[in-house]
Structures are given as C-alpha cells and as structure tokens.
Amino acid sequence: MTFVRIGQFNALPGTTDALRRIYETEAIPVIRQAAGNVSALLLQQHQSPESFMAITIWKTQDDAEAYDRSGQAMEMVAKIKFAFAGPPTLGTYEAYGIPKAA
C-alpha cells in the first residue's frame, strides 16, 4: 500500500518566497532520491499564501520511516524552520488510486 505524509504549516509573513525556493531546490531533490520515494511536492494555498502543505509519497511506510531515521528529514526541516509561524502538523495516510510505483 502506498504511504503518504502531509505536513501542514504556516509561514511567517515575508518568508514565503525563500521557503518555497529552499524547499523546491534543496528539499525536494533530496527527498526524491530517497529509497522508496514516489514523489514530493509543496503546495501553497491561493487564498492564504502563508499556508503550506508538504506532501511526500512513499512505496511503503518502512521507506518513509527509513528516510526519517537517516536524519535527512530533520536536515530539511532545519533549512526551512526559520519561516515557521508555529509548529507544523504531520498526518500519515494510506493512499488509494495511485498507480503502482515501479
């Protein structure tokens, strides 16, 4: 079963451009290279531009947990935490309807 993590957070005013640039150029490439990663993306809400969702999709829960244990997840959070208006929330989900990853 495909495993999805969704991190939700709000950014401080004036930090959204830098946060988006760092996540897109530094975090996403690292996450996508991790074993078992299917996709990684960052969503920014139109109605509230300080509101973000970071979504990672994994072949298995074990793959996501191995990425966490590697320390890379915390390194990526450290690069963008300057922009957090408060603590992020993390939800985990089983995904249905996603084409089977190779």
State what each model feature region is:
Residues N10-Y23:
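Short, surface-exposed ligand-recognition loops at beta-strand->loop->(often short) alpha-helix junctions
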Residues T2-N10, S39-S70:
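Short, well-ordered beta-strand segments in beta-rich or mixed alpha/beta enzyme
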Residues T2-F3, S39-E50, M76-A102:
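Glycine-rich beta-strand-turn "strand-cap" elements at beta-sheet edges
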Residues I22-V38, I57-G91:
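An amphipathic, aromatic/His-enriched active-site/gating alpha helix that lines ligand/cofactor pockets
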Residues A11-P13, T60, E94-G97:
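Non-catalytic surface loops within mature trypsin-like serine protease
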